[in-house]
Each structure stands twice: as C-alpha cells, then as structure tokens.
C-alpha cells in the first residue's frame, strides 16, 4: 500500500474562531502533557492528524500557526516551558563555587557509573538536526551514550573531532553508531556521507557498525507518516519519490525505538546494577562534602598563631 502524499490545498483557510483556537490549544496541551519534551515541529505533525476535532493544514502556514499557539500557551502559563525541547540556542557558562564543599556537592550529582564497562560494544547516536537531538537528549543521558547533532551535512572538523576522541580512548571494542534523520533526497545522503567520513578518520582497529534507525521507507508505511512531494529541482537521490521529516514520527515512538536499540547492546540488568553502584558512590561523595565543610582542628602551633592575630 502506498502512503498518500499530501499536497498544499488550494482552499483558503477561514480564520479560526475563539472556540476553535481553544480546541487547538487543548489538543496541543494534551499532546505535550502525554509526552515531553517535544519540539514544536513534533507537535505540529501531531496537529495535522485529520481525526482531531481541530486539525491544521500540512503546510508552512499550518506550522507557523501551531508555533504561534505554542508561544501563547507558554506565555500564558498553561504549558510549561520545559515541555519544549530546543538545542538550537545555548549559552556558555563558567561555573564557580563558594568552597571546596560547595564544589563537591555540586558535582556529586554528575557522577555516573559506567553502564558500558562490561558491554561488548560502544555506542554513539548521531542525528541530522538539533531538533531531533533535543528530543532524545535525556534518553541518551540515561543510557550514557554520546549524542552528536550534525546540523545537516556535518562539518569535516566536527566528524574528525568525534573520530579522534574514539581513536584516543584506547577502547578496542566495536563502535555502534545509530543515526536518525529525514527521509528525503538530501537526507538519505547525509548518513552515507557521515559514515564515509567516520571510516576515513577512524583507525583501522576500530570496527564501525552504522545503522540508520529512522526515518526509513518501512517506517513510513508502518506508522503512516505524512509525506511531502520532493522538490522538482532537486536532482539528488532520484529513487526517493517523497520527503518525510524525522519529526513526523511521534517523539514517544522515536525515543522507544532508540531505547530498544541501545538497551539491546547493554548487559542484562546493566541499568539496575549501575543505579545501585551510583547510590553507594554518591554517599561517599556526600561524606566528602561534609568533611570539606567541617573546619579541621588546629594543632598547637596553628592555634598559638591564630591567638596572636
């Protein structure tokens, strides 16, 4: 069965009434409450479902409308800001601490046990866009895998830096890379270019295993993903007859696919074992912080010097 290709309609959309806007807002709220964080583009694709009471059109105009409602929902306080994922803008900070105890307390929460110590492979996740990366970031953190957003065709320096990190690690286990990107004439070339460049820079002893886990042709049919006609001017990948953005796959589904793939590489009960180890080590770090916070007793000479002052 062929997936239907949606083309821009010719009918002019009538301005929504207050009741229709309220219904659209309710739909957006429900989607985000059920699963977050999501990018605005993920929410937009959910709002194009014709089965909804108030769907939006599959067009740039429809996206801008959803984007506008998402802004209003955040500003009104109806939707939490952190329900939206956005890695496109980040600040750069220098952390400072009031004391050694403050430092130990602050960094204790960053401690992670090595989930991959006894695994047969290493694992990384690459995504075509920061939009996708922002949605899967928390899962990558929980699973202790590095995440690299390409931003389209990735820069050679970015790939070289990632490969150099692998080469310098001293880890001789195979490297599994999972990739997520758009299925369109350009998108199906990005992961091929990435894999080729990684192989170019990785040392020969590093066995690279590369798998595109989304979006692929089978998923378009399996999940009934909305498609767009390919640009007639684009002469790349002529065997690709349509365009499907990675964000058209519901964020919850995408995260589930990723977790299943990554967890299959981990030893049995690795997450549970690591959690127990982390709790024990965190207790030691907390004890260390208390030791730094407690003034050390002065010896006799130090006490006399303090009295003289």
What does each of the following model-derived ranges do?
Residues 184:
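Catalytic metal-binding/acid-base residues of hydrolase active sites
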């Amino acid at each position: 069965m062929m997936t239907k290709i949606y083309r821009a309609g010719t009918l002019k959309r009538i301005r929504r009434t207050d009741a229709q806007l309220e219904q659209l807002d309710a739909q957006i709220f429900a989607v985000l409450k059920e699963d977050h964080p999501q990018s605005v583009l993920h929410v937009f694709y959910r709002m194009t479902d014709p089965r909804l009471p108030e769907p939006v059109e599959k067009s740039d105009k429809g996206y801008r409308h959803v984007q506008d409602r998402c802004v209003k929902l955040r500003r009104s306080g109806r939707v939490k800001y952190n329900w939206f994922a956005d890695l496109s803008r980040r600040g750069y900070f220098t952390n400072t601490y009031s004391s050694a105890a403050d430092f130990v307390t602050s960094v204790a929460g960053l401690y992670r046990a090595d989930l991959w110590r006894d695994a047969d492979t290493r694992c990384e996740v690459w995504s075509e866009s920061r939009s996708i990366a922002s949605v899967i970031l928390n899962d990558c953190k929980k699973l202790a895998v590095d995440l690299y957003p390409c931003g389209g065709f990735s820069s050679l320096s970015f790939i070289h830096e990632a490969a150099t990190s692998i080469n310098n690690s001293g880890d001789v286990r195979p490297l599994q890379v999972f990739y997520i990107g758009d299925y369109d004439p350009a998108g199906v070339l990005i992961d091929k270019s990435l894999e080729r460049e990684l192989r170019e820079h990785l040392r020969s002893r590093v066995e690279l295993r590369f798998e595109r886990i989304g979006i692929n042709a089978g998923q378009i049919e399996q999940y009934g993903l909305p498609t767009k006609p390919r640009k007639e001017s684009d002469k790349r990948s002529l065997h690709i007859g349509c365009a499907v953005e990675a964000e058209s796959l519901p964020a919850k589904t995408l995260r589930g696919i990723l977790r299943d793939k990554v967890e299959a590489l981990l030893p049995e009960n690795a997450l549970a074992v690591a959690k127990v180890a982390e709790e024990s080590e965190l207790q030691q770090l907390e004890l260390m912080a208390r030791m730094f916070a407690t003034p050390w007793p002065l010896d006799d000479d130090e006490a006399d010097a303090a009295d003289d002052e």
